[in-house]
UniProtKB/Swiss-Prot annotation:
Name of the protein this chain belongs to: Homeobox protein HD1
Record keywords, A-Z: DNA-binding, Homeobox, Nucleus
BP-aspect Gene Ontology terms: regulation of DNA-templated transcription
Induction notes from the record: By wounding; up to 7-fold increase.
Family membership noted in the UniProt record: Belongs to the TALE/KNOX homeobox family.
Tissues where this protein is expressed: In roots, stems and cotyledons of one-week old seedlings. In mature plants, in young leaves from first level below flowers as well as in flower buds and open flowers.
SMART domains for the chain: HOX, KNOX1, KNOX2
GO molecular function, a single term: DNA binding
Top-level taxon of origin: Eukaryota
Keyword Transferase: no
Annotated function: Possible developmental regulator.
Residues annotated as domain ELK: 197-217
Length: 294
């Protein structure tokens, strides 16, 4: 992986010309040595690896890590060929590597977008095929076929058009076999990775909003709670007037003075208190009406 990257960059920067093949090969080795010892080499390698990871199934990522763990041997080999560039050549190499890293970062973003879009489309297409097969035969594809994904996919509720008339998806294979249209284990692993990344992005994107809403709810709860001593005064009045717990305006004015609460807070407390004791209130009203009739 590193050798291929260094070779490609070396050929881009130091290649060309009609000189002898041996001279060109030596120039390429020197260029690789300069790149391997350049301060931006770590950034360059990280950018290459980031692009490679995008389309690499999860079960194959350890292969990349294994290659990176042995990279120091290759670096020592190339570093030994570095002879030192002139100031002008060094500046050109600096500029080239900086631009190349930027290109790789942009390429990684394009790869991510491409993989995500097509992976989701592939999942939905396979789901449609599985449903069609079930409708025709009543059979359900097994887990080993690679057709089923995690049940969490159902939560996405994505709708894609199924109008694919006139398009040949068979790829030269027998459509009745369904095999060529089903993802392999590696493809399923890649799709699962894309799904996890999408869920993480959605969670991160809405995290701040969720926290704001939660804080607003807690603020309103704190604002809605009355001090304990004030509720004691209100409860005492309630107990004394439980048969008809509807304070007059004069009663409310007196409660405002005693508790220090606002009139709106007192009104809300009595409304909520009557709701909490609705059954008892109904019984009291019925008794009161009966007494008035007699």
């Amino acid at each position: 992986m590193q050798e291929a990257a260094l070779g490609m960059i070396g050929a881009t920067v130091g290649g060309g010309g009609d000189g002898d093949a041996a001279v060109v090969a030596e120039q390429n080795r020197q260029m690789k040595g300069e790149i391997a010892t350049h301060p931006m080499y770590d950034q360059l390698l990280a950018a290459h690896v980031a692009c490679l990871r995008v389309a690499t199934p999860i079960d194959q990522l350890p292969i990349i890590e294994a290659q990176l763990s042995h990279s120091h041997h290759l670096l020592r080999s190339y570093a030994s060929t570095a002879v030192g560039f002139s100031h002008h050549d060094r500046q050109e190499l600096d500029n080239f590597l900086a631009q190349y890293v930027m290109v790789l970062c942009s390429f990684k973003e394009q790869l991510q977008q491409h993989v995500r879009v097509h992976a989701v489309e592939a999942v939905m297409a396979c789901r449609e095929i599985e449903n069609n097969l079930h409708s025709l035969t009543g059979a359900t594809l097994g887990e080993g076929s690679g057709a089923t994904m995690s049940e969490d996919e159902d939560d996405l509720q994505m709708d894609f058009s199924s109008d694919n008339s006139g398009v040949d998806f068979s790829g030269g294979h027998d459509m009745t076999g369904f095999g060529p249209l089903l993802p392999t284990e590696s493809e399923r692993s890649l799709m699962e990775r894309v799904r996890q990344e999408l869920k993480l992005e959605l969670k991160q994107g809405f995290k701040s909003r969720i926290e704001d809403v939660r804080e607003e709810i807690m603020r309103k709860r704190r604002a809605g709670k009355l001090p304990g001593d004030t509720t004691t005064v209100l409860k005492n009045w309630w107990q004394q007037h439980c048969k008809w717990p509807y304070p007059t305006e004069d009663d409310k004015a007196k409660l405002v003075e005693e508790t220090g609460l606002q009139l709106k807070q007192i009104n809300n407390w009595f409304i909520n208190q009557r709701k909490r004791n609705w059954h008892n209130n109904s019984h009291s009203l019925t008794s009161l009406k009966s007494k008035r009739k007699h």
